[in-house]
């Protein structure tokens, strides 16, 4: 087991993930979301739960910094509370920080300002304190495949037996949080396609989405998206 995964297990993220799966499963599920519920039921399997931590969360928690350019470090070992701003209000992103709604939220910042770090902190706190199952994706790595297809691949990689219909059911259930990092890093020819998919996922399914981007990109000026700086 690599040191980052060992640290994640040590601080209790595995147990937190189990609790959030149980919390989501215990909600009142409408009949049309049966396929989505099946995905959550499978997440409670010990092997699949372990893979969610090792193959998904652990990967997202590994970071490189200026002082550690050749080795991965754990988010918690380097994180100092950062602040985001909106409408004259300063909001500190620290322990127990949550954004829980059905909106598209975009965190804007310069290169090196901490956007990706903040998004990873939101991922961590969502597992520890939230009521939705979070999935983290780096947009530059999935732009060719798209968000929904990439999410399906992540879920299938965990060993979950599912299909597109069940995934759509899960997305529409209100129990998923999508964390999409680096809109500005998408190739210019793919940006409008990815932005359209982000908007469609939110409008069709009501799924909560949090993105990051440098200023001046298409997502920063799109209507009905909440921007933080």
Predicted regions, residues:
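P-loop NTPase signaling cores
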Residues: 2-44, 48-229
